[in-house]
């Protein structure tokens, strides 16, 4: 039977009790981690979010009733204990912060009993993730998850303090917004009052923070909840948190400078890591050419090498065919791996195909300087020597090549580079390599839409020196956009925004927007800008991803209290779920029957 805690007041969390309290009376409360009955004494490990404290029950101190009660305790019972702190008389437990003290109980109350949990509440649980997420309220009791969430709380606190000291105003923007279908898929919310009309949950506060700049709030900041109905992966959730900011009367360098200082301060305050600033900057084109990625992991080499010029006249049709079709031939040097088993090379080929390649060419440089290759018979010895020299190959190296359109070649070799870097132990997991990727293309061509699309969003300012190409070569126009990358992860990004009417109108025209469509989707923003808007720029980065890097986990679910699984469902609450037909009727919604798959 559960007891009341009336009249009791917790004096300390478990690990707040220390040698300084020896001889003092304390009141502690928490969960029973473990009970050991030694006959005349009962030992209980009491757990709260701070850690574990040993409680000792002896009949002479706690009384017959209290001792009997202690004997009934099981894992996860919630108890309150009054007692006196003393130095441990038995062996000290070096693994516990409180390992050299204990509390001699003088009274106990069982505040809540517990049934046997489906898994043991312990560090590094081997329980399947599905079971852990189904009973997330139990999983959240585990010390490692609690440390993760406490670190996350600290990250948010430090961010807020820093931004306030920098003169930013924390302003909340709406959650119920208008759908603007230029980005990822929206989560839609039907309106009960306006039948047939829908709100959208925000993918970001983009439009509202620009409106705040037009309204004179020259430094805005928000810890923003954002929603995207897109396929999930290890570092992506349908709802996520970003640190969002916008500044007026600034250019790229101003935004980059304040964010570098923020990240330096954050890593020092939260995990005591010194981050050097300024961060390196790399144009998008260079990142793609060197690393095959716009979010390169610069902790190791194995950079891509363009060998198109070397092989343009060779007899290997795969290479020359790719070049004739406007593509390129590039390679990576996997140093010291010439003796990689053929089965492993075949796996690399399959991985390359999974990334869009038709195949993968390879060349092994034997220790005697001879070559073993999938294409050597199509090239002369001089051509092979020139190719190896271009790749800085030496005896013992394995050279891998992809030939196709640039986009495919970058994707294939970039993915192989990351896979091999991890498998061969080339990545220093203790390094924090920050990088700004800049000068992104303003536009990218969509075969599906048969038009140019904004690589970021329609309000991104083009680089002034490229603007004269907007009609003749739109794909060559670079944007005043920048992404912040950490160890191969895009933490976030931003841009300088368009604040000039003529540039914005031209941007909409290039994107295929009529004036009517532009006004229908973004009229409130365009109207606001007609009343005077300052030059402005901003950035947002993912809080979840920063926490992942600080904790060295590649699973975003480990840093979110109540995450979704891969199909965007919540195993604990069973969301999404069906709703009462009356609710649907009020909203004017009829659910279409699913068609049977043939």
Curated annotation (Swiss-Prot):
Region Aspartate, annotated ranges: 206-209
Keywords: Aminoacyl-tRNA synthetase, ATP-binding, Cytoplasm, Ligase, Nucleotide-binding, Protein biosynthesis
Any one of the GO CC terms: cytoplasm
Annotated PROSITE patterns: AA_TRNA_LIGASE_II
Record localization: Cytoplasm
Signal peptide: none
Pfam family name, one: tRNA-synt_2
Superkingdom, natural source: Bacteria
Catalysed reaction, written as an equation: tRNA(Asp) + L-aspartate + ATP = L-aspartyl-tRNA(Asp) + AMP + diphosphate
GO biological process, alphabetically ordered: aspartyl-tRNA aminoacylation
Sites where the protein binds ATP: 228-230, 237, 490, 542-545
Enzyme Commission number, as recorded: 6.1.1.12
Role description: Catalyzes the attachment of L-aspartate to tRNA(Asp) in a two-step reaction: L-aspartate is first activated by ATP to form Asp-AMP and then transferred to the acceptor end of tRNA(Asp).
Subunit structure and binding partners: Homodimer.
Name this protein carries in UniProt: Aspartate--tRNA ligase
Name of the gene encoding the protein in the UniProt record: aspS
């Amino acid at each position: 039977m559960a007891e009341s805690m009336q009249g009791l007041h917790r004096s300390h969390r478990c690990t707040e009790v220390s040698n300084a309290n020896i001889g003092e009376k304390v009141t502690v409360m928490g969960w029973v981690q473990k009970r050991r009955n030694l006959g005349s004494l009962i030992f209980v490990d009491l757990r709260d979010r701070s850690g574990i404290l040993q409680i000792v029950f002896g009949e002479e101190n706690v009384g017959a009733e209290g001792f009997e009660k202690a004997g009934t305790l099981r894992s996860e019972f919630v108890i309150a204990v009054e007692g006196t702190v003393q130095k441990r008389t038995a062996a000290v437990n070096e693994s516990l912060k409180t390992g050299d003290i204990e509390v001699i109980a003088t009274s106990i109350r069982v505040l809540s009993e517990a049934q046997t949990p489906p898994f043991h509440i312990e560090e590094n649980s081997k329980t399947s993730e599905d079971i852990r997420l189904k009973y997330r309220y139990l999983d959240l009791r585990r010390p490692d998850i609690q440390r993760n969430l406490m670190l996350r709380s600290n990250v948010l606190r430090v961010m807020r303090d820093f931004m306030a000291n920098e003169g930013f105003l924390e302003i909340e923007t709406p959650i119920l917004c208008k759908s603007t279908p230029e980005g990822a898929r929206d989560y839609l919310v039907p309106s009960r009052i306006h039948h047939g009309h829908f709100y959208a949950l925000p993918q970001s506060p983009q439009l509202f923070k620009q409106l705040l700049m037009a309204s004179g709030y020259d430094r805005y900041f928000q810890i923003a909840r954002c929603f995207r109905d897109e396929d999930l992966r290890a570092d992506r959730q349908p709802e996520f948190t970003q640190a969002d900011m916008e500044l007026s009367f600034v250019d790229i360098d101003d935004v980059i400078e304040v964010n570098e200082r923020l990240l330096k301060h954050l890593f020092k305050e939260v995990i005591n890591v010194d981050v050097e600033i300024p961060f390196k900057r790399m144009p998008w084109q260079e990142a793609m050419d060197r690393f095959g990625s716009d979010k390169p992991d610069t902790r190791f080499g194995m950079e891509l090498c363009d060998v198109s010029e070397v092989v343009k006249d060779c007899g290997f049709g795969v290479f020359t065919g790719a070049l004739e079709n406007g593509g390129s031939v590039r390679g990576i040097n996997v140093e010291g791996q010439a003796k990689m088993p053929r089965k492993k090379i075949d796996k690399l080929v399959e991985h390359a195909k999974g990334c869009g390649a038709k195949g993968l060419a390879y060349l092994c440089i034997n220790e005697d300087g001879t070559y073993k290759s999938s294409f050597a018979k199509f090239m002369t010895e001089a051509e092979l020597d020139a190719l190896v020299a271009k790749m800085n190959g030496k005896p013992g190296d394995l050279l891998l090549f992809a030939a196709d359109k640039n986009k495919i070649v970058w994707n294939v070799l970039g993915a192989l580079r990351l896979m091999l870097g991890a498998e061969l132990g080339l990545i220093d997991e203790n390094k924090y390599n920050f990088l700004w990727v800049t000068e992104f293309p303003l536009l990218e061509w969509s075969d599906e839409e048969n038009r140019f699309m904004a690589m970021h969003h329609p309000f991104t300012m083009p680089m002034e020196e490229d603007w004269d190409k907007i009609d003749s070569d739109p794909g060559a126009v670079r944007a005043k956009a920048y992404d912040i990358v950490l160890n191969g992860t895009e933490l976030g990004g931003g841009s300088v925004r368009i604040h000039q009417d003529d540039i914005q109108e031209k941007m909409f025209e290039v994107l295929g927007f009529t004036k009517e469509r532009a006004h229908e989707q973004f009229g409130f923003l365009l109207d606001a800008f007609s009343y005077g808007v300052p030059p402005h720029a901003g950035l947002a980065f993912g809080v979840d991803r920063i926490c992942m890097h600080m904790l060295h986990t590649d699973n975003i679910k480990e840093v979110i209290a109540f995450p979704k699984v891969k199909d965007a469902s919540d195993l604990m609450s069973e969301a999404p779920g069906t709703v009462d037909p009356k609710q649907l009727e009020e909203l004017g919604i009829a659910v279409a029957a699913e068609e049977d798959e043939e």
